[in-house]
């Protein structure tokens, strides 16, 4: 049985036409439909022409949002030796080695991002069942397995995000807050599009971009004209 929509959602859906909107118009409409009583995130959902069950069609990488994420990212670091001090000085919220691994193993996950140095990954790998489903497992592709902790912490705190295509080939990403100006949201969305194009999997055949929708956390889905976004040139 289909879930009955609230009157609020019904009213918001009526504002959205069944068309692919020009990027700026879509973002303005997303802001207009962000009527919840909290600071809603700006979400983008992108369906790509890939089948991630094949290794050469997987997409997992990072993007730096030029206008930031609009939220404070809690960064935890698993390291040892002098790297512990480096991470602390760089502003990591949690730093540790065996003690932090033990806490995580008990289900204490009070961070949004986990970074680790390569030498501790054999121990971190044991946490895969806990971290993997939450998208928190450090990886070289995601920039979260590194010896340059200071740079990694700085970038992720400033708006760098790791993303991946799920098993159906869809990328789900938060690219800011609905309170951002349209211009800021557009800059961030353009950065996401360019990153996905730049990191096109070698095995991707045929039509790469299938559909792109944006929405507020509690708002209706709004289709964006993909070609218009890809052709868009932002003035610096």
Swiss-Prot record:
<comment type="subunit">
    <text>Part of the 50S ribosomal subunit.</text>
</comment>
<keyword id="KW-0687">Ribonucleoprotein</keyword>
<dbReference type="InterPro" id="IPR028364">
    <property type="entry name" value="Ribosomal_uL1/biogenesis"/>
</dbReference>
<dbReference type="InterPro" id="IPR005878">
    <property type="entry name" value="Ribosom_uL1_bac-type"/>
</dbReference>
<dbReference type="GO" id="GO:0019843">
    <property type="term" value="F:rRNA binding"/>
</dbReference>
<dbReference type="GO" id="GO:0015934">
    <property type="term" value="C:large ribosomal subunit"/>
</dbReference>
<dbReference type="InterPro" id="IPR002143">
    <property type="entry name" value="Ribosomal_uL1"/>
</dbReference>
<dbReference type="InterPro" id="IPR016095">
    <property type="entry name" value="Ribosomal_uL1_3-a/b-sand"/>
</dbReference>
<comment type="function">
    <text>Protein L1 is also a translational repressor protein, it controls the translation of the L11 operon by binding to its mRNA.</text>
</comment>
<keyword id="KW-0820">tRNA-binding</keyword>
<comment type="function">
    <text>Binds directly to 23S rRNA. The L1 stalk is quite mobile in the ribosome, and is involved in E site tRNA release.</text>
</comment>
<dbReference type="GO" id="GO:0003735">
    <property type="term" value="F:structural constituent of ribosome"/>
</dbReference>
<keyword id="KW-0678">Repressor</keyword>
<keyword id="KW-0694">RNA-binding</keyword>
<keyword id="KW-0699">rRNA-binding</keyword>
<dbReference type="GO" id="GO:0006417">
    <property type="term" value="P:regulation of translation"/>
</dbReference>
<comment type="similarity">
    <text>Belongs to the universal ribosomal protein uL1 family.</text>
</comment>
<dbReference type="GO" id="GO:0000049">
    <property type="term" value="F:tRNA binding"/>
</dbReference>
<dbReference type="GO" id="GO:0006412">
    <property type="term" value="P:translation"/>
</dbReference>
<keyword id="KW-0689">Ribosomal protein</keyword>
<keyword id="KW-0810">Translation regulation</keyword>
<dbReference type="InterPro" id="IPR023674">
    <property type="entry name" value="Ribosomal_uL1-like"/>
</dbReference>
<dbReference type="InterPro" id="IPR023673">
    <property type="entry name" value="Ribosomal_uL1_CS"/>
</dbReference>
<dbReference type="Pfam" id="PF00687">
    <property type="entry name" value="Ribosomal_L1"/>
</dbReference>
<protein>
    <recommendedName>
        <fullName>Large ribosomal subunit protein uL1</fullName>
    </recommendedName>
</protein>
